[in-house]
Amino acid sequence: MSNKAATLLAALSGAALVAAHGHVSHIIVNGVYYQNYDPTTHFYQPNPPTVIGWSALQQDNGFVEPNNFGTTDIICHKSAAPGGGSATVNAGDKISIVWTPEWPESHIGPVIDYLANCNGPCETVDKTSLRWFKIGGAGYNPNTRTWAADDLRANGNSWLVQIPADLKAGNYVLRHEIIALHGGSSPNGAQAYPQCLNLRIVGNGNNSPAGVAGTSLYRANDAGILFNPYVASPNYPVPGPALIAGAVSSIPQSKSTATRTASATLPGAPVVTPTAGPVVTTSSAPVVQPPTTTLVTVTSAPATSAAPAPTGGAGVAPKWGQCGGNGWTGPTVCASGSTCTVLNPYYSQCI
């Protein structure tokens, strides 16, 4: 049996045991829509489309756990391989990165963006050779009392990041990531969701920031990884290296509207300087009322204890859904075949 067939069978047999978190669906830049790799469909297609996003064994929309932060899985997700094409953008452009499905309300945490120069075609680059520098990293905002992941949800499940205007032209990989901290108070409880996309950046800049290997970005016990997000006023240190000179933690967030779609640019194609679309619109994100139930996936759970007998809360929480925790007002009774289990004082889950 082929490796792909074996993986397919494993994924199908485990379908009932997993629940979606998310992946990047597409990006919008200068009004142009570029499709990302879809791990929930493209993996199963004999001839998937050529896209800008890196493929990964993320069929469950799952995560990379802290115990694997020293492995190549943290670079661009599990067993990631380069996308077959790229999107051409200008240095200084703003890129809207759109996730699917809706990011869970419970999965609070930072949103972090990196770039790495491929020094050649990104479509064939060795991911271990990439050196990442941070161009954005937003955590907890004490003024709004929101996490960056909250802001992403409120912004239509999208995040706006800006390419440095003085960046040297070349082929780069954009590494965009959410780190969910709902289980972060326990060892190996944080969840990293790295997503990688190939960019061909054009411009006249000469800035070539130094970077670090992907396997050196984080450690399992870093202050921003092993962290309790449920304290009254979190003083949260965004993990990873410092922002490059001139970068900010995040730019003002707005939603972007695509006016046309484009296919990934294949290696060796002529460089065409992109121009802004004539009717691209952006708007401040409306406040999105979060749902009262969530679905989560756990690939490995920290030591747990049985939850107290469920009380209050209407309805039934699905397997892998939240069923308790300080302040929780949703369902506390689990679906048949699962038990409400305490992961920490703030989060209990049907396991």
From Swiss-Prot:
Residue numbers binding Cu(2+): H21, H107, Y193
List positions binding O2: H182, Q191
Question: Which cofactors does this gene product need?
Answer: Cu(2+)
A single MF term (Gene Ontology): cellulose binding
One Pfam family recorded for the sequence: CBM_1
Comment on bound cofactor: Binds 1 copper ion per subunit.
Task: Quickly give the catalysed reaction.
Answer: [(1->4)-beta-D-glucosyl]n+m + reduced acceptor + O2 = 4-dehydro-beta-D-glucosyl-[(1->4)-beta-D-glucosyl]n-1 + [(1->4)-beta-D-glucosyl]m + acceptor + H2O
The family this protein is said to belong to = Belongs to the polysaccharide monooxygenase AA9 family.
Name by which UniProt lists this protein: AA9 family lytic polysaccharide monooxygenase A
Species annotation: Podospora anserina (strain S / ATCC MYA-4624 / DSM 980 / FGSC 10383) (Pleurage anserina)
